[in-house]
């Protein structure tokens, strides 16, 4: 670099004047409450998602259209439609390249991130590089290939959760609290908010999952100060948090964890065990057979769940490969042996979180289990042993605790929480230290890790060179002392500083983290009042406004397409229901069997048989075709039925029976 350029532009040196470092806690946001409707709480999980709402003084966890209170975070594409949840997951074995799961591992990350590179090898669908970000490439229909951002796939899951809540509440929902792992950095939080926008949701708050779990737990624990350890071992991530609860006031003391440890890793170990076993017994390597792997993955998960309550399970899969049926036992002891190192690995973050909080084991009053994987007896035992025999608390359903807490927070924000939540004060924390680079590549920390947010800190810096007119502010997150070992979030220049001897100018740098953990940085030359600022967004691969708008539009088009598919299915079901209803009536002695002339019966039989054959040959006909066919069959059957009932003085059962049935979706 030329000498002159070096004089004008260099790093900063700490002048050491700390102006202020106030912490602000937040309670009920009344100004927000005035403009928010009902605010639902969504736990957007790596493997499963869950939605709740605060209603009539308590939280309701809402079941989906399959009757399940947790929904797989899976999306699948077939030639005719897009599936979300159970339907998508069930299709994985036969449709692996077009079934997308674990997208939370990609959201807010760069394509060359080592985690993304590692995960690419573990999923059957294709991940491609677009503008340095990982996008998912799938065939949607008629051989058409499309790429989706992780935000778009997450938005599809959020839409499913939103629709689940809307069906239960009987009204449109616009506002939500969405949870993220405590370890999510700013890019991942921003991307999660963007996913909400694409799904048509205003994400009123992003809160940490363990914090949400603590709220779920805290409602009935208002007496005195308690230290609580939240142990959250889900399908994809592991988080440990230590909180204090004092008369309804929550404070997070520390967080730790592992972004890649959870139930799926335990499933993977079971799969690897069986893949080796199959190779040994049958000489067949199924590790590249996506269809077989999909079937095996589903059974591995089922076996793991069963082993939490029984000591042995038989894994049975019909026609796993080459027409060979698979049947093998798996004991709890073998399962524990396969995962022993992973189970033990969970204790490291527990110890680190304890050290960060500055607490002894005896000072933990309650241990709260969150996430389905905490049902595993060995995990519970290791935790109990670590805390010298203290029993973990099981008063909260581990699958639902996070959504429950998010729903309570939603109740607070919407003002629907009432007396039960009015005393809750929620203090969240910054998951990683935030700072800037100063001379020598030093990471100068402005907001230490675990600082309560929202927060604002300012510090005055000065110039390193005489006559320096520009400074570059480089913003980093991380715990290391040199910026080369931390993560660059963004940078900007403050220009137009009046030339002066080194150490003279005063440049005030202000870091502000809002309640969602999103960072704004401002630098101001105190002499001239000139300032520059940055919200850490696009520099970190966040979607642009245009991209978000395009994705919102596409999401609406998908919704329109989904609506058309549903209308087509409804029309088909109406025809099928009418035909079967008619066939039942003409063969039932209590209904029409004895009242019809043989030629009348034959006419109806011919019309219904022909309709069923037409249905078999026209599986994917259009809605109008099904409606037209129904009219044709009705034109034959209804006059006969009406005449019969007029003769006998009854109601024309064929018509009313059929139309009544039309109002109900078939299971």
Curated annotation (Swiss-Prot):
Keywords: ATP-binding, Endoplasmic reticulum, Glycoprotein, Nucleotide-binding, Signal. Residues 644-667 are annotated as: Disordered. SUPFAM superfamilies: Actin-like ATPase domain (SSF53067), Heat shock protein 70kD (HSP70), C-terminal subdomain (SSF100934), Heat shock protein 70kD (HSP70), peptide-binding domain (SSF100920). Residues 1-25 form the signal peptide. Residues 658-667 have a biased composition (Acidic residues). GO terms for biological process: chaperone cofactor-dependent protein refolding; endoplasmic reticulum unfolded protein response; ERAD pathway; protein refolding. This is Luminal-binding protein 4. It comes from Nicotiana tabacum.
């Amino acid at each position: 670099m030329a000498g002159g350029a070096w004089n004008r532009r260099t790093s900063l040196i700490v002048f050491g004047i700390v102006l202020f470092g106030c912490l602000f806690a937040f309670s009920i946001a009344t100004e927000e409450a005035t403009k928010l409707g009902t605010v639902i709480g969504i736990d957007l999980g790596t493997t499963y998602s869950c939605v709740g709402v605060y209603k009539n003084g308590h939280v309701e966890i809402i079941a989906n259209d399959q009757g399940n209170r947790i929904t797989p975070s899976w999306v699948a594409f077939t030639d005719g439609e897009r599936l979300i949840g159970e339907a998508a997951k069930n299709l994985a074995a036969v449709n692996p390249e077009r079934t997308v799961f674990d997208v939370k591992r990609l959201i807010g990350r760069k394509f060359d991130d080592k985690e993304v590179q590692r995960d690419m090898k573990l999923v059957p669908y294709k991940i491609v590089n677009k503008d340095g970000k990982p996008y998912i490439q799938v065939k949607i229909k008629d051989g058409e290939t499309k790429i989706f951002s992780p935000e778009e796939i997450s938005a599809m899951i959020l839409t499913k959760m939103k629709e689940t809540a809307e069906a239960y509440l009987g009204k449109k929902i616009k506002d939500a609290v969405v949870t993220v792992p405590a370890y999510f950095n700013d890019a991942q939080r921003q991307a999660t908010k963007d996913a909400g926008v694409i799904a048509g949701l205003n994400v009123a708050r992003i809160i940490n999952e363990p914090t949400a779990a603590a709220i779920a737990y805290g409602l009935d624990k208002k007496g005195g100060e308690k230290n609580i350890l939240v142990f959250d071992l889900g399908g994809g991530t592991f988080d440990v948090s230590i909180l204090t609860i004092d008369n309804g006031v929550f404070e997070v003391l520390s967080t730790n964890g592992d972004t890649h440890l959870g139930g799926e890793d335990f499933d993977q170990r079971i799969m690897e065990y069986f893949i080796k076993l199959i190779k040994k017994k049958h000489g067949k390597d199924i590790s590249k057979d996506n269809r077989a792997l999909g079937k095996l993955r589903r059974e591995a998960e089922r076996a793991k769940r069963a082993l939490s309550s029984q000591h042995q399970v038989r894994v049975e899969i019909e026609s796993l490969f080459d027409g060979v049926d698979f049947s093998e036992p798996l004991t709890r002891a073998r399962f524990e042996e396969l995962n022993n190192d992973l189970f033990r690995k969970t204790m490291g973050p527990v110890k680190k979180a304890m050290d960060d909080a500055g607490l002894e084991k005896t000072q933990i009053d309650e241990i709260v289990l969150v996430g389905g994987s905490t049902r595993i007896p060995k995990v519970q035992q290791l935790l109990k042993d670590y805390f010298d025999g203290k029993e973990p608390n099981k008063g909260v359903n581990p699958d639902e605790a996070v959504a429950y807490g998010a729903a309570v927070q939603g109740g607070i924000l919407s003002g629907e929480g009432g007396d039960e939540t009015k005393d809750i004060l929620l203090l969240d924390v910054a998951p990683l230290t935030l700072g800037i680079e100063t001379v020598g590549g030093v990471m100068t920390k402005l907001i230490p890790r675990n600082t309560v947010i929202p927060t604002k800190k300012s510090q005055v810096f000065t110039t390193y060179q005489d006559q320096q007119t520009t400074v570059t502010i480089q913003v980093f997150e991380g715990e290391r002392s040199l910026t080369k070992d931390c993560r660059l979030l963004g940078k900007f220049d403050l220009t137009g500083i009046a030339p002066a001897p080194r150490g003279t100018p005063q440049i005030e740098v202000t870091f502000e983290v809002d309640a969602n953990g999103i960072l704004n940085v401002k630098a101001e030359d105190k002499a001239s009042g000139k300032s520059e600022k940055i919200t850490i967004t696009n520099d970190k691969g966040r979607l642009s406004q245009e991209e978000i708008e395009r994705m919102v539009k596409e999401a609406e088009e998908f919704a329109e397409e989904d609506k058309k598919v549903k209308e087509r299915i409804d029309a088909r079901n109406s025809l099928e229901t009418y035909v079967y209803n008619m066939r039942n009536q003409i063969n039932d002695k209590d209904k029409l069997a004895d009242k019809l002339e043989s030629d009348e019966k034959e006419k109806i039989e011919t019309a219904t048989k022909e309709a069923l054959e037409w249905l078999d040959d026209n599986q994917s006909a259009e809605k109008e075709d099904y409606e037209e066919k129904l009219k044709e069959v009705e034109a034959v059957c209804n006059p006969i039925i009406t005449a019969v009932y007029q003769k006998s003085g009854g109601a024309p059962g064929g018509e009313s029976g059929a139309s009544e049935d039309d109002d109900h979706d078939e299971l």
